[in-house]
């Protein structure tokens, strides 16, 4: 008798567990659905890798996309041209100030406009900044060498 009641209890418990399972028809939550209202042309995203030059990449991206907005053709401007001349001017100023200012990698978006006004601008194909067999920008060694040299 005890075995039968234990068996019936176990069977009823299992049937409740089986009936408590979710059905396949349960609603699946959807993620956000975005609707394009207006699609603007943009230049492709570029990889700065490990160069500490996000300021140059973002400033150049701003200029390239603004040219597209104005109806000009797409152009790929050189980020490393800006970095080169910005670092050169920083080094000259650092020496003139007898080391009494900050000299390190990095900069600001305003540096892009400064270099553009003073030195002009060139396309990426003219000056890509990769001259030692590397396929991406890695400025850790450059930053250390330039700092010790200056």
Model-derived features: positions:
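Catalytic-core signature of thiol
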Residues: 23-150
């Amino acid at each position: 008798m005890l075995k039968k009641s234990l068996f019936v209890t176990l069977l009823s418990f299992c049937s409740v567990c089986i009936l408590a399972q979710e059905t396949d028809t349960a609603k699946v939550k959807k993620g956000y659905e975005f609707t394009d209202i207006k699609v603007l042309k943009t230049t492709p995203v570029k990889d700065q890798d490990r160069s500490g030059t996000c300021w140059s990449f973002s400033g150049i991206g701003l200029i390239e996309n603004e040219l597209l907005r104005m109806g000009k053709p797409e152009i790929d401007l050189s980020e490393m041209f800006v970095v080169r001349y910005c670092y050169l001017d920083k080094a000259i100023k650092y020496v003139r100030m007898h080391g009494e200012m900050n000299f390190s990698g990095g900069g600001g978006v305003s540096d892009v406009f400064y270099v553009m006004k003073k030195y002009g601008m060139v396309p990426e194909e003219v000056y890509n900044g990769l001259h030692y067999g590397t396929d991406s920008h890695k400025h850790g060694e450059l930053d250390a060498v330039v700092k010790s040299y200056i």
